[in-house]
């Protein structure tokens, strides 16, 4: 068995599409860049509003994976997603890495990193449906399918659950607290 990567921590932000993971991460990123690394996901989808990722073709993704440039990757919704290997370097250097990942890769991450912190973001179905419609990435039947999709890792425990029906600051501050706790840094007040 390969030795797990540390001494830093990997904060895995998980939750269904439309719960606000990217917004919470952007909020926390602005307030924790000194202690945390937020790698851009590599996705086989063109860039668009509301998601900061590295758009690549299927061929580019496969080549990056074969060259070992991805720490972890997974297929979802007809696309492929990956976290750059810079995550391994940062965790190995003692930093906190924060990434939006699929719940389906949590066991793989637990085997890869010495310290895995799982943050599950949830929101009411009504708010989630509104957010998915506002995003405009898919037609109404696709939104219904997303709302009905079961959890791919129902048995995996979350270390923190953020109910993201409130303000961005409410949820963002909860995520920030998790990141700073993982880094052993104090939460600034005021």
Curated annotation (Swiss-Prot):
Q: Which domain of life is it from?
A: Bacteria
Which keywords does the record carry? ATP-binding, Nucleotide-binding, Transferase
Q: Which reaction does it catalyse?
A: alpha-D-ribose 1,5-bisphosphate + ATP = 5-phospho-alpha-D-ribose 1-diphosphate + ADP
Might you give the EC number(s) for this enzyme? 2.7.4.23
The answer to keyword Transport applying to this record is no
Annotated region described as Disordered, given as residue ranges: 135-159
Give a yes or no for keyword RNA-binding in this entry: no
Annotated pathway, please?
Metabolic intermediate biosynthesis; 5-phospho-alpha-D-ribose 1-diphosphate biosynthesis; 5-phospho-alpha-D-ribose 1-diphosphate from D-ribose 5-phosphate (route II): step 3/3
Q: Which GO terms describe its molecular function?
A: ATP binding; ribose 1,5-bisphosphate phosphokinase activity
Q: Could you tell me what this protein is called?
A: Ribose 1,5-bisphosphate phosphokinase PhnN
Lineage of this protein's species? Bacteria, Bacillati, Actinomycetota, Actinomycetes, Frankiales
């Amino acid at each position: 068995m390969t030795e797990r990567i540390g001494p830093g921590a990997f904060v895995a932000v998980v939750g269904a599409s439309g719960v606000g993971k990217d917004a919470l991460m952007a909020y926390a990123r602005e307030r924790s860049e000194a202690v945390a690394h937020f790698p851009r996901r590599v996705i086989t989808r063109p860039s668009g509003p509301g998601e900061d990722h590295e758009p690549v073709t299927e061929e580019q993704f496969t080549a990056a994976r074969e060259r070992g440039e991805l720490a972890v990757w997974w297929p979802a919704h007809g696309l492929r997603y990956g976290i750059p290997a810079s995550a391994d370097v940062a965790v190995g250097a003692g930093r906190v890495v924060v990434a939006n990942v699929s719940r389906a890769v949590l066991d793989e991450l637990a085997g890869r990193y010495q310290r895995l912190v799982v943050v599950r973001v949830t929101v009411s179905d009504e708010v989630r449906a509104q957010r998915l419609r506002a995003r405009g990435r898919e037609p109404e039947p696709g939104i219904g399918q997303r709302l009905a999709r079961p959890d791919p890792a129902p048995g995996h425990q979350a270390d923190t659950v953020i109910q993201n029906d409130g303000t961005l600051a409410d949820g963002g501050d909860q995520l920030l607290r998790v990141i700073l706790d993982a880094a052993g840094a104090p939460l600034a007040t005021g």
